[in-house]
């Protein structure tokens, strides 16, 4: 609530493969396809739509999802730019550690997450990860660090909720 009024809209940046990139005030619940239509439509066939920004955003399954409170950006990628890379084994370069703004050890956390070791990941502070994407961005092996941490954090939270019941 701002000034006693509920949040029903927000300014959202729409960029990428759209004809007229813009900052639009969108109401909560606006369909992404309609927002892109306000920008003149697609310039190319959309290969991927990212909701929330390039570092911490999440891929939308299609353009029929809706704008929510956290939707500060919509990025549209064409097929060529949307291709995902094969993850390579960690080369232990340490760039992820240097990039982490809160001093975590992403390479170790990723190893534990990949093994499904929730307790080990939690003991190595995966819950402290702010999911900023810096580690994934600098990784020369194209490791999907951030996604792995987010999924592991979600799994730990699910386990905690289950344990409370």
Predicted segments with their positions:
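Redox cofactor-anchoring modules in respiratory/redox and cofactor-processing assemblies
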Residues: 1-141, 147-154, 162-165
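Positively charged, low-complexity nucleic-acid-binding target-recognition regions
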Residues: 157
């Amino acid at each position: 609530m701002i000034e006693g009024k509920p949040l029903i809209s927000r300014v959202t940046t729409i960029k990428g493969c759209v004809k007229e990139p813009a900052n639009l005030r969108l109401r909560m619940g606006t369909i992404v396809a309609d927002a892109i239509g306000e920008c003149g439509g697609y310039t190319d066939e959309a290969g991927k739509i990212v909701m929330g920004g390039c570092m911490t955003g999440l891929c939308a399954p299609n353009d029929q999802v809706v704008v929510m409170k956290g939707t500060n950006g919509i990025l549209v990628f064409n097929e060529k730019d949307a291709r995902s890379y094969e993850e390579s084994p960690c080369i232990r370069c340490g760039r992820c550690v240097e990039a982490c703004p809160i001093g975590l050890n992403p390479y170790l956390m990723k190893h534990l997450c990949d093994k499904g070791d929730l307790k080990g990941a939690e003991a190595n502070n995966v819950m402290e990860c702010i999911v900023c994407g810096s580690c994934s961005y600098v990784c020369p092996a194209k490791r999907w660090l951030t996604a792995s941490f987010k999924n592991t954090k979600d799994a730990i939270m699910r386990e905690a909720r289950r344990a409370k019941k």
